[in-house]
């Protein structure tokens, strides 16, 4: 019964259709979405069986999304279009911010993954480091003013070392997977985003 409930309500990890800013429809999956708390629901079911009390209540979720009706990411989210090398921010259905970007370097297999994610947190004044080498140094160390991760070590940040964004830069001189942004644009995005906000990445 609980597994049937999960199959009905869970959206995390499922494939969903996203209508992009450019007008395409793309199929995306990812960790963002609703997820029933199967342990809690099982415990509640056992309790109801033991007490004989049948009660109507809300289903308990271990992970929540923005909306139960329509697209579960709702109408406030960030969209990263790899093909256009552009980021869009929607708030309550209105486009309120956008910027050119540089994503993961395709030629070095640092391609940024597609998917539906949520912003983990945001932090100002951060040093981003690559993998640690045997001698104790790091593959790279980059100071950023605005750090907004959403997929492990992948996130939005300013890239003051770049003078150009957009175009085909990502194919030969892209990032290690992050979404590089102009400093002034990153500052404005930083002011808008919040923990748990949906982030949709697509080709």
What are these regions (language model features)?
Residues 51-52, 111-124:
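Short, surface-exposed secondary-structure junctions/capping segments
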Residues 14, 114, 130-203:
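Exported/periplasmic cell-wall-interacting domains
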Residues 65-109:
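A structural motif detector for short, solvent-exposed N-terminal "entry" segments of globular domains
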Residues 78-80, 88-90, 97-99, 118-121, ...:
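Structural recognition of the beta-strand scaffold that forms the well-ordered cores
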Residues 85-87, 95-96, 104-108, 123-127, ...:
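Solvent-exposed loop/turn segments at secondary-structure junctions
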Residues 1-77:
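Short glycine/threonine-rich beta-strand-turn micro-motifs
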């Amino acid at each position: 019964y609980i597994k049937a409930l999960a199959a009905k309500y869970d959206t995390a990890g499922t494939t969903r259709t996203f209508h992009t800013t450019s007008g395409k429809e793309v199929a995306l999956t990812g960790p963002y979405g609703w997820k029933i708390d199967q342990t809690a629901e099982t415990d509640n079911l056992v309790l109801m069986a033991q007490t004989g009390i049948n009660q109507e209540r809300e289903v308990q979720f271990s992970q929540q999304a923005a909306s139960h009706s329509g697209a579960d990411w709702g109408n406030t989210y960030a969209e990263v279009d790899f093909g256009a090398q552009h980021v869009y921010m929607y708030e309550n259905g209105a486009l309120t911010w956008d910027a050119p970007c540089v994503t993961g370097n395709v030629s070095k297999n640092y391609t940024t993954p597609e998917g539906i994610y949520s912003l983990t947190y945001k932090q100002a004044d951060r040093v981003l480091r690559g993998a640690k080498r045997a001698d104790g140094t790091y593959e790279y160390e980059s100071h950023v003013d605005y750090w907004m991760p959403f997929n492990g070590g992948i996130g939005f940040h300013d890239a003051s070392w770049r003078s150009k964004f957009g175009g085909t830069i990502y194919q030969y001189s892209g990032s290690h997977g992050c979404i590089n942004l102009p400093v002034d644009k990153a500052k404005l995005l930083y002011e808008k985003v919040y923990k748990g906000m949906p982030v949709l990445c697509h080709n």
